[in-house]
């Protein structure tokens, strides 16, 4: 078997891993993870695409997603869960794609990247939006219910393109 075929077969067996990152990992990134998991399930890609989320700070480590985000997501039949965690050096090697929710987190993720070579692509979530000119997914933490709805609208928009992006990576 040629080495190209071996690599191709390995790609078919290994899932494409996506990490969503915001500041505290209690609002935007766990919601992005939940939206993406729902979309992946609906597309029948459970075995090909895996998702997780993390924060750039450790302040909320161990906490569940914000109850307001959980409620807003639940109203759309999307289930949030898990516990907040901080991004770590292994994430840069284990994930194929790291998506940040805003410019500050993008800069933080880049600055936290290990000096050694890492395999993850680091991109901004909003680069995948098709129905909005937004350049950041706003942090709804200090606002009202409408902020959580806006975040979910953006996440649902972007996740459609992210699935296609991941599909293209899996096929290669």
PLM features: residue spans?
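Phosphate-binding/catalytic loops
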Residues: 2-4, 15, 97, 103-172
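Conserved active-site segments centered on acidic
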Residues: 2-94, 164-172
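Hydrophobic beta-strand core positions in alpha/beta domains
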Residues: 20, 99-100
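Helix N-cap/beta->alpha junction signal
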Residues: 29, 102-103
């Amino acid at each position: 078997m040629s080495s190209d075929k071996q690599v191709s077969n390995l790609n078919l067996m290994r899932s494409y891993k996506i990490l969503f990152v915001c500041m505290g990992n209690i609002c935007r990134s766990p919601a992005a993870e939940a939206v993406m998991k729902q979309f992946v399930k609906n597309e029948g890609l459970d075995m090909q695409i895996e998702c997780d989320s993390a924060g750039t700070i450790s302040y909320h480590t161990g906490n569940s997603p914000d109850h307001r985000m959980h409620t807003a997501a639940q109203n759309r039949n999307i289930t949030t869960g898990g516990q907040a965690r901080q991004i770590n050096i292994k994430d840069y090697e284990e994930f194929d794609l790291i998506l940040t929710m805003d410019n500050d987190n993008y800069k933080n993720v880049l600055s936290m990247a290990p000096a050694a070579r890492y395999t993850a692509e680091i991109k901004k979530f909003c680069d995948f939006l098709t129905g909005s000119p937004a350049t950041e997914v706003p942090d709804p933490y200090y606002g009202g219910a409408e902020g959580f709805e806006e975040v979910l609208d953006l996440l649902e928009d972007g996740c459609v393109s992210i699935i296609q992006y991941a599909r293209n990576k899996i096929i290669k």
